A protein has these predicted regions:
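Classical Sec-dependent N-terminal signal peptides that target proteins to the secretory pathway
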Residues: 1-22
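N-terminal propeptides/low-complexity segments immediately following signal peptides
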Residues: 20-69
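N-terminal segments that cap or nucleate solenoid repeat domains
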Residues: 80-115
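Structural signature of tandem alpha-helical TPR/SEL1-like repeats
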Residues: 84-92, 120-130, 157-166, 192-203, ...
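Canonical positions in the second alpha-helix
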Residues: 97, 133-134, 169-170, 206-207, ...
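Short helix-capping/linker turns of helical repeat alpha-solenoids
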Residues: 99-102, 116-117, 136-139, 152-154, ...
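Hydrophobic face of amphipathic alpha-helices that form TPR/SEL1-like repeat modules
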Residues: 108-115, 120, 145-152, 179-189, ...
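Terminal, low-structured helical/coil segments at or just beyond the last alpha-helical repeat
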Residues: 324-384
Length: 384
């Protein structure tokens, strides 16, 4: 029960898809010679999101709550100031209109109080108040976010029953984030309950159909593992590829996609695409991908051998105490020249991961390995 509550003490907020720039340590020139890779750079994270993402290692209660549903205020506007010739400040007007029932203002005020934006001091109780007002208008986004506040005890006492009720209502109204939140809740605690598993699968499917990329990966992974449904690698490849590419760039999707390409499951075996997918996940700091990519470059079987990069990658993984990484790194020492070792050390030392915004959101909200939600609920058939 303690583990159940600890895992669930997270903020299931809807998120806004903004994406971080790729790193260039493991660049095309270093890894695959002249092979080019499309950039996933879109735009920089806004100030409020940067504030929450700095706490990535320990997780953040605030995740990436959805932005205000309107453009009422710019990110730098000081809304408490009264303009010349005006009777009230933008803030006073927004409060008045929120009290008069304006959903737009209720959502914006809830967001600004939660983040302490636009000249307002952060006030969790007021954030809760305005999201509650918006939720009473049956707005699914407000319901989902209010459920998150109840779930985490932000601005109010924790109330799991109210949180789940709000998530369920928001899901019924088509909110893909609420459906996703419910699915993860059903899979928390590794109950291995076929009824809960089926509900989770259906919710992943519902959320994916609404365009949620996290749900798309989970649905693909369910087909990959044979979770609730029979194993179907073609379906797995279809969904996982979408979650790995485009603007989503989910690191775990890239990792599994690389495995599919390596083994030729659901698609034609393609080692170049496998290496490219491993690299993409490694650039986001995915330690499994870093270790697998190191193995690939050390072996030199599916891509040209590169002991410098293999050593650097093992070193990066070893610094995170990844099993066998230090041993594999040390085994390469005897095969490398001093200059190569120096280059490898510098490469590892300069490494800085650059997770996509969606990857950061997943890590902050659901953890660093969301595949475990399915893996830990797999039911092994007793039939022989």
């Amino acid at each position: 029960m303690k583990n159940f509550l600890l895992i669930l003490c997270m903020c299931f907020f809807a998120y806004a898809p903004v994406y971080a720039e790729d790193m260039d340590l493991l660049s095309d020139e270093m890894l695959l010679g002249s092979e080019s890779e499309s950039s996933t750079t879109d735009k920089k994270v806004e100030d409020a999101d940067e504030k929450t993402s700095q706490d990535e290692e320990g997780g953040s209660f605030f995740g990436f709550i959805i932005k205000p549903i309107s453009n009422l205020f710019g990110s730098g506007d000081k809304i408490t100031e009264v303009a010349e010739g005006e009777k009230e400040s933008p803030f006073e007007r927004s409060v008045r209109q929120a009290n008069e029932g304006s959903l737009e203002d209720q959502m914006s005020l809830g967001y600004m109080y939660l983040y302490g934006a636009n000249g307002l001091d952060a006030d969790m109780e007021k954030a809760f108040k305005y999201y509650e007002m918006a939720a009473k208008q049956n707005d699914p986004i407000a319901m989902n976010n209010l459920g998150s506040l109840y779930f985490s005890g932000i601005g109010t006492k924790k109330n799991y029953d109210k949180a789940l009720s709000l998530f369920a209502k928001a899901s019924e109204l088509g909110n893909d984030n609420a459906s996703l939140n419910l699915a993860f809740i059903y899979l928390t605690g590794a109950a291995k309950d076929p009824v809960r598993n089926k509900k989770a699968f259906d919710l992943f499917e519902k959320s994916q159909q609404a365009g949620n990329k996290i749900a798309e990966f989970m649905l693909g992974y369910a087909y990959y593992k044979g979770f609730v449904v029979d194993v179907n690698y073609a379906e797995a490849y279809k969904y996982i590829k979408e979650a790995a590419n485009g603007k989503a760039q989910i690191d775990e999707a890239q990792l599994v996609l690389a495995d599919l390409y390596t083994k030729g499951l659901g698609t034609v075996q393609n080692y170049a695409s496998a290496v490219k997918a491993y690299r993409a996940a490694a650039n986001q700091g995915n330690m499994e991908a870093i270790l697998k990519l190191a193995d690939v470059y050390a072996a030199g079987t599916i891509t040209p051998q590169n002991l410098v990069l293999a050593h650097a990658l093992y070193n990066i993984a070893a610094a995170q105490n990844i099993t066998d990484a230090a041993q594999k790194r040390d085994e390469l020492n005897e095969k490398m020249q001093l200059e190569e070792l120096t280059n490898a050390q510098m490469t590892a030392q300069n490494f800085k991961s650059s997770p996509s915004e969606l990857t950061k959101y997943i890590r902050q909200t659901y953890g660093y390995n969301i595949r475990n939600y399915i893996d830990n609920n797999m039911i092994v058939s007793s039939k022989k």
